[in-house]
Design a protein with these regions (language model features):
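N-terminal helical cap/lid subdomain that shapes the substrate entry/recognition surface
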Residues: 2-94, 115
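Asp-based, Mg2+/Mn2+-dependent phosphohydrolase catalytic module
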Residues: 1-6, 98, 103-224
Length: 224
């Protein structure tokens, strides 16, 4: 496959979102400890990673400890405002470097996308970045993809979108005529498309396989 532009999702596509969750939970626990004088770090880790309470985590914690639900918003803010460095997947930087000859875009529905890019140290790799929550929209809106393609001056037929979540990542770019590639990795590994037009054109299990699909060649060896 030869393309003139490659666009990426961010969470679980270029890095492991669980690392973002871990650092965010630490920051939220630090803030709660500053308010209460008690440590809830272990409880938050248990709820999120062991009991898999990934929605309403802070509500559940506050309920368990009979603390005011009014603290939820502040804890969510601390979670997303964490500043600890994040690490891309080991092969991410090498893959992006190998794609330097074509424009690169990034489209993410994840809150705090700009903060994540800075913490990952890969912002400068991208020629166009759209973080949909800042625009009060999502990747379900074709305008999001059209905006990036216009900024990169390429047509949909010349572009590819790489993502991981078949619920949201592929339907719109498929409809626009973009090629789509799923990285089956991360939180949504076991989720299958619920409709035909949400299925990707290609599927890979390791990001450096993208170079093979795009006929770019193998990346330079990376340190693990």
């Amino acid at each position: 496959m030869r393309v003139s532009c490659v666009c990426f999702d961010l969470d679980d596509t270029l890095y492991d979102y669980r690392e973002y969750a871990r650092t965010g939970l630490e920051a939220a626990a630090d803030r709660l400890e500053a308010y209460t004088g008690e440590s809830y770090h272990d409880d938050l880790h248990r709820l999120y990673f062991e009991e898999r309470v990934t929605d309403g985590t802070f509500d559940r914690l506050l309920e368990e400890h009979d603390l005011s639900q009014s603290l939820v918003e502040d804890l969510v803010e601390a979670y997303h405002d964490a500043t600890a460095p994040l690490s891309p997947y080991p092969e991410t930087t090498a893959v992006l470097n190998r794609l330097h000859s074509v424009p690169l875009g990034l489209i993410t529905d994840g809150r705090g996308g700009h903060n994540k890019l800075d913490r990952l140290g890969i912002r400068d790799q991208f020629d166009s970045v759209v973080v949909t929550p800042t625009l009060d929209t999502t990747k379900c809106d074709p305008v999001v993809f059209r905006t990036v393609l216009a900024e990169l001056d390429v047509s949909p037929e010349e572009a590819v979108y790489v993502g991981d979540d078949p619920r949201f990542d592929f339907r719109v770019p498929n409809q626009l005529g973009m090629a789509t590639i799923r990285l089956r990795r991360g939180r949504y590994t076991d989720i299958e498309p619920d409709r035909e037009d949400a299925a990707p054109d290609h599927e890979i299990r390791h990001l450096d396989r993208l170079l093979t699909v795009l006929s770019v060649g193998e990346p330079e060896p990376t340190e693990n």
